[in-house]
């Protein structure tokens, strides 16, 4: 099936979501995303830590994932290894946002745009991210994988995002 436009949420929908998800999202920014991304998030009012802030610089992905789970922080990274459910199981997933880098290998502008889209979807609510892996492709299309299945979205410059229907 083709892309179709999502329905605009009603005010009641927004209020209900706000009541369900009261905790503010906190981020853990991976080394490959860079300290600049952590600073941008902090400057936007988010609780964001860079791996070095937690003594995790140079540590393996499993250590980073465990620390994020313990502190309930959403991992922000360019590293698609975090999408592997065998290494990083969904039931112990604090939330992962993977932004595939552009052709230059590092695209923090794209990362920040994609994070803004993720927060637009979730509000500022930490609970929404738990158990989800958000995978932004280099064209900023989004695939969300969770125990509830897999959903694909495509943002446009104006209007609601499109959702892919199988």
Segment roles from a protein language model:
Residues 1-28, 33-47, 62-66, 103-166:
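Feature 3881 marks metal-assisted phosphotransfer/nuclease machinery
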Residues 31, 78-80, 101:
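Short secondary-structure boundary segments
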Residues 47-59:
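Conserved BB-loop
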Residues 55-56, 63-66, 70, 83:
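Amphipathic, hydrophobic secondary-structure cores in small proteins
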Residues 60-64, 87-91:
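Short secondary-structure transition/capping segments
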Residues 66-68, 92-96:
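Short, hinge-like loop/turn segments at secondary-structure boundaries
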Residues 69-87:
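Acidic, metal-binding active-site segment of PIN/NYN-like and related structure-specific nucleases
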């Amino acid at each position: 099936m083709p892309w179709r436009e999502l329905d605009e949420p009603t005010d009641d929908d927004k209020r209900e979501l706000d009541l369900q998800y009261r905790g503010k999202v906190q981020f853990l920014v991976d080394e490959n995303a860079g300290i600049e991304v952590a600073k941008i998030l902090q400057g936007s009012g988010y609780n964001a830590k860079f791996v070095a802030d937690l003594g995790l610089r140079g540590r393996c992905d499993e250590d980073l994932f465990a620390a994020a789970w313990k502190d309930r922080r959403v991992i922000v990274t360019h590293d698609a290894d975090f999408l592997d459910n065998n290494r990083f199981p969904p039931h112990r997933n604090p939330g992962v946002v993977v932004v595939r880098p552009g052709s230059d290998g590092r695209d923090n502008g794209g990362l920040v745009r994609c994070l803004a889209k993720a927060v637009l979807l979730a509000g500022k609510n930490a609970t929404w991210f738990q158990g989800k892996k958000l995978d932004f492709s280099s064209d900023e299309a989004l695939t969300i994988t969770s125990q509830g299945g897999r959903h694909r979205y495509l943002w446009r410059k104006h209007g609601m995002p499109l959702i892919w229907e199988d």
